[in-house]
A protein has these predicted regions:
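Conserved glycine-rich Rossmann-like NAD(P)H-binding loop of the short-chain dehydrogenase/reductase
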Residues: 116-129
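Conserved Rossmann-fold NAD(P)-dependent oxidoreductase catalytic core, especially the SDR/UDP-sugar
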Residues: 167-170, 174-230, 234, 238
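N-terminal Rossmann NAD(P)H-binding glycine-rich loop of SDR-like oxidoreductase domains
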Residues: 93-110
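Strand-loop microenvironment adjacent to phosphate/nucleotide-handling motifs in alpha/beta enzyme folds
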Residues: 4, 11, 45, 51, ...
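Conserved residues in the N-terminal Rossmann fold of short-chain dehydrogenase/reductase
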Residues: 124, 148-149, 189
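Residues in the short beta-alpha loop(s) of Rossmann-like NAD(P)-binding domains
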Residues: 126, 216, 319
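Conserved Rossmann-fold cofactor-binding substructure of NAD(P)-dependent oxidoreductases
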Residues: 146-167
Length: 417
C-alpha cells in the first residue's frame, strides 16, 4: 500500500517538475509558480476522490511526531528538556486564559499528564467547551482541574480566578484577521483591555510568572489584530516595571500559524475536500507563513517559563512554507484558484524586525528580544551561549533559511489529524 511519504514524493514530482518541497535550507522560495486553474468536470470528480484518499493516508500515525503521548493517539514522549522544565510546576497552581481553545486544551492536557501541578485552572467564556474539555480529560483524572467561566474583559472575575495562582498562560484572544477588521471595538476589548486585566490581576494576587501568547502579526502590523497584539505585548513587557521589587515577572511568546488550530487553513482545506470541492482557493500564490504544531507551541511556552527573567519576547526558530505548496500537498489533484488577499492580510510574516535586531539574542532553538529596560542585563543569556544577531537582522517567512520539505509537511499534517 502506498505510504504517506511516498504519496507526498509523487505530489512533489508532479506539482511542477522540481519542487521547493525538497529541503531548501538557506534558499528562498522560487516565485515561478504555475497554477492549474481549470480541469474537465469528469476529472474533477476523480480528483476529489483522490484528495480524500490522500487525507486518509495523512491521518495515519507518522513514524515521528512532536506530540506528547496522550488522548489523541500520539505515541512519542515529551523531549527531555520539556520534561525537566515540568518540575517548575510541582505543587503549583497554573491558570490558562482561553483554556478551552486549541492551544489551551493541549497545554492543559500536557500539564495533566506530565506535571505535578497542584491545580490547573481553565478560564474561558464557553460553558459547553468546558463540558467538552472535562469529558475529553476524564480518562486522565480531573481531580486537579478547575473550570472558571469568565471573560478576560471582566477584571473582577479574573482577580477572583487568579487568587493563589503561581503561573498564568494568557492564551485568550480574538484572532481572526477579517473579523477584527470588521469588529474593531470587540477586538480591542478582548486583546488589549483583556491584557490589562490579566496584568492587574497578576499584580494584585502576586502571581509568580506570566507568559502571554502573541503572534507574528504583531511585528510590523498592518491589521487591527496585529496592532492589538502589539499593544498587548507592550502591556505585558511594561508590567515588569509595575512589579517593582517583587518577584512577579511577565514575558511574551511570539510564533506563527498553528497547524490544525480552529479557523486555520488546514481544517478549512480538509472541510472542502470532505465536501467534494472541485478546487482549493488560495489568496496569493506567493504567500508564505511560519508554521508550528500545537505541541511544539506548548513545549516552547513551558521551556520559556524556565528561562524568563522578565520583559523578553521569545521567538522559536520554526520553518516556513508556501501556501500553494501546502494546498498541492494536501490535495495534489485538485486545481487551485487564486481568490485574492483578505482584508488585513500580508503576503509574508515577520517575527523579528530589523528594528528589533539590536535587542535580539540568538540561542540554539530560539531568538530572544530583550526589553529596553535600564535595569536589564543580558549576562545570564550570554553565559548560556546566546549570541547577538547582526545589525539589521530580520526573521521573516519569505527569507527564512528553513523550509518544510515533503517529509516535514507529512509530519505536520499527520499530527494535525
Amino acid at each position: 500500500m502506498t505510504t504517506a511519504s511516498a504519496l507526498l514524493d509523487r505530489r512533489v514530482a508532479t506539482a511542477r517538475g522540481k519542487s521547493v518541497l525538497t529541503r531548501t535550507r538557506k534558499t528562498a522560495p522560487r516565485e515561478d509558480v504555475g497554477l492549474r486553474m481549470t480541469k474537465p468536470v469528469a476529472k474533477m470528480k476523480s480528483a476529489s476522490a483522490s484528495a480524500k484518499n490522500s487525507i486518509a493516508l495523512l491521518r495515519r500515525p507518522a513514524p515521528f511526531s512532536s506530540a506528547a503521548a496522550g488522548l489523541n493517539g500520539a505515541a512519542n514522549p515529551l523531549p527531555d528538556d520539556v520534561l525537566h522544565a515540568m518540575r517548575q510546576f510541582d505543587d503549583r497552581a497554573v491558570l490558562v486564559t482561553g483554556g478551552s481553545g486549541s492551544f489551551g486544551r493541549r497545554f492543559v492536557e500536557t500539564l495533566l499528564q506530565h506535571s505535578r501541578a497542584r491545580r490547573i485552572i481553565v478560564f474561558s467564556r464557553d460553558e459547553y467547551k468546558h463540558y467538552e474539555l472535562q469529558q475529553h480529560l476524564e480518562p486522565l483524572g480531573t481531580e486537579r482541574m478547575r473550570f472558571f467561566i469568565g471573560d478576560v474583559r471582566d477584571g473582577d472575575r479574573l482577580e477572583i480566578a487568579t487568587r493563589e495562582v503561581d503561573y498564568i498562560v494568557h492564551a485568550a484572544a480574538l484572532k481572526q484577521v477579517p473579523a477584527a477588521e470588521y469588529n474593531p471595538f470587540e477586538c480591542m476589548r478582548t486583546n488589549v483591555t483583556g491584557a490589562e486585566n490579566v496584568v492587574r490581576a497578576a499584580l494584585r494576587n502576586n502571581v509568580n510568572r506570566v507568559i502571554a501568547l502573541s503572534t507574528d502579526k504583531a511585528a510590523n502590523p498592518i491589521n487591527l489584530y496585529g496592532a492589538s497584539k502589539l499593544a498587548s505585548d507592550k502591556i505585558f513587557i511594561a508590567a515588569n516595571n509595575m512589579a517593582g521589587k517583587t518577584d512577579i515577572r511577565f514575558a511574551v511568546v511570539r510564533y506563527g500559524n498553528v497547524v490544525g488550530s480552529r479557523g486555520s487553513v488546514i481544517p478549512f482545506f480538509r472541510k472542502l475536500v470532505d465536501e467534494g470541492a472541485d478546487h482549493l482557493p488560495i489568496t496569493d500564490e506567493r504567500m508564505t507563513r511560519f508554521w508550528i504544531t500545537l505541541q511544539q507551541g506548548v513545549n516552547f511556552v513551558i521551556t520559556s517559563f524556565t528561562m524568563m527573567r522578565g520583559g523578553e519576547i521569545f521567538v522559536p526558530k520554526i520553518p516556513s512554507m508556501r501556501i500553494v505548496d501546502l494546498a498541492q500537498c494536501f490535495a495534489p489533484d485538485l486545481p487551485l484558484r487564486v481568490v485574492g488577499i483578505r482584508p488585513g492580510e500580508k503576503l509574508h510574516e515577520v517575527m523579528v524586525t530589523e528594528d528589533d535586531s539590536r535587542l535580539t539574542l540568538e540561542l540554539a532553538d530560539r531568538y530572544v528580544i530583550e526589553p529596553a529596560f535600564a535595569w536589564w542585563q543580558r549576562a545570564p543569556y550570554t553565559a548560556s551561549g546566546a549570541k547577538t544577531v547582526p545589525d539589521g537582522f530580520r526573521f521573516a517567512s519569505n527569507t527564512n533559511t528553513d523550509w518544510l520539505d515533503g517529509e516535514g509537511l507529512r509530519r505536520l499534517l499527520a499530527e494535525a489529524f
